[in-house]
C-alpha cells in the first residue's frame, strides 16, 4: 500500500502543522485522524463520518457540558437563581445562539460555497486565537443574518 498524495492530503498536513504551531490539540488530532482515514483503508468510512460527524460531535460536546452537573462540581440553580437577570440573560443568549446555529446549518446546506470561507476562518480562529470548532455553525448563522438567507 502506498500513500496517496493529493491536495486534500497536503491541506490536512498544513492543518496539522498549524495545529502544532498554534498549540491547538483539537485541530491537530482532527486533521491527523482525517489524514490517516484518507490515506488508508479507513477512507470507506469518510462518507459515514461526513453524514453523522456533526451530530456525533454535538452529542460529545453536550456530554462534556453536562458532565460537571452530573459529577456534582456544578449544582443546579435554585429558584431564586433561575429568576435572576443573569440567568434570564444566559437563557436568552443560549436560545439566540442555538437559533443562529440552526440558521447556519440551513445556509451551509443551501450555499455550500460559503462553507470554504467559514472553514478557513474557523481554522484560523482555532489555530491562532484559541477558538474551538463550533464556530462554523454560528458563523454561518451570522452570515445568514447578513445575507438575508434562511
From Swiss-Prot:
What are the protein's UniProt keywords? Cell membrane, Membrane, Transmembrane, Transmembrane helix
Where in or outside the cell it occurs: the entry states: Cell membrane
Q: Name one GO cellular component term.
A: plasma membrane
Q: Which domain of life is it from?
A: Bacteria
Residues passing through the membrane, by range: 1-21, 52-72, 82-102, 114-134
- Kindly list any coiled-coil regions of this protein: none
Task: Report if keyword Cell membrane is assigned.
Answer: yes
The way this protein sits in the membrane is described as:
Multi-pass membrane protein
List the Pfam families: DUF441 (PF04284)
The Swiss-Prot or TrEMBL record describes its family as follows: Belongs to the UPF0756 family.
Record protein name field: UPF0756 membrane protein HD_1071
Amino acid at each position: 500500500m502506498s500513500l496517496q498524495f493529493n491536495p486534500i492530503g497536503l491541506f490536512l498536513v498544513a492543518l496539522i502543522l498549524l495545529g502544532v504551531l498554534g498549540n491547538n490539540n483539537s485541530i491537530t488530532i482532527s486533521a491527523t485522524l482525517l489524514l490517516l482515514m484518507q490515506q488508508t483503508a479507513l477512507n470507506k468510512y469518510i462518507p459515514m463520518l461526513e453524514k453523522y460527524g456533526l451530530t456525533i460531535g454535538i452529542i460529545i460536546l453536550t456530554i462534556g457540558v453536562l458532565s460537571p452537573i452530573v459529577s456534582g462540581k456544578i449544582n443546579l440553580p435554585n429558584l431564586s437563581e433561575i429568576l435572576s437577570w443573569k440567568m434570564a440573560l444566559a437563557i436568552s443568549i443560549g436560545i439566540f445562539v442555538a437559533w443562529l446555529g440552526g440558521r447556519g446549518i440551513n445556509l451551509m446546506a443551501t450555499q455550500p460555497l460559503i462553507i470554504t470561507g467559514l472553514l478557513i476562518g474557523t481554522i484560523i480562529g482555532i489555530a491562532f486565537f484559541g477558538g474551538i470548532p463550533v464556530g462554523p455553525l454560528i458563523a454561518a448563522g451570522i452570515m445568514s443574518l447578513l445575507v438575508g438567507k434562511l
